[in-house]
Amino acid sequence: MITRRAFIGALVGGFLAAPLGAEGQKPGKIARVGLLLVGPALSREEIAKAATTSPFLLGMKELGWVEGQNMVVERRWGESPDQLRAAAADLVRRKVDVLFVSSASLAKILQLETKTIPIVVSAAGGDLVAAGLVGSLARPGGNITGLQILSDGLIPKRLELLKAVVPNLSRVAFLQEDVTLWALPQMSARYDQLAAIAARTLDIELHTFIVHRAGEFATAFLGMMKNRDQGVLVMSTPFIFVHRREIVDLAAMHRIATVYEYQLFVEPGGLMSYGVNIPEMSRRGAVYVDKILRGAKPGDLPIEQPTKFEFALNLKTAKVLGLTIPPSLLQRADQVIE
């Protein structure tokens, strides 16, 4: 059973904002939206199901854009940077009106293929300016806009949560993907710096485990056990998100506490998360796509940053791990899985 307390992000406010004026799509014209996705390609049945559950597509529908009626959605998938680069090139060749992605790494791949087709990113986990993807937050200036999540205060908070629930916590593993493969070394370096500073402040010894491809997660967890790590801080990238169930299962098998960026890791069995509401970020991303389809230029649309973060907790997982959740911590949870 899932209970929710104040499960409304600040980003929801105004998400049904009125469309832009008379400019943009001509009456009767079909909008073409491209989605670049991480993972194996879906079947037609899976695509049909996703169309009824996708927060982005639901957001588009609420704004008047319905797939199969006045909008065509081109989907392309990949499971590695090389595959995604090929998928991005294919989307660009199809001359879609706007491209939509969930992360900075995917936006970067698309930007290498096109400097003209607008790109909307719904949850860029890092500084888009420092990564060279936009000129400034107030005026991106190029063909990328959307929402970004700065981790400066979030990584320390996640480590604090681990410390609050794991007795005598002193050794933590930091599981991350090699984002340099996505040509975003600045973001990787920033993550490492923030985690190292937070660990020192909390008197925690941090051990970094970097996965490069599918199949390396099991080896990483074996390394954590060898190091006698007591908890795992999990970085979220599209690749890690696709493999979230494997990560959750490995953590359960090795009986180790975990803290994630998003509640979508906690629902299948992860212990805790602290971060933004990803479905709401996707719905907010739809607002950007709508504005662009109606004539706005991406370079003129300011980058948004969420101010509301949610703490999700899986009590069932805590019980299996033999952890007692302090009542004060439980009261602060926005989402509790019992």
Indicate where each model-derived feature is located:
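Short hydrophobic alpha-helices and adjacent helix-cap/hinge residues
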Residues: 1-338
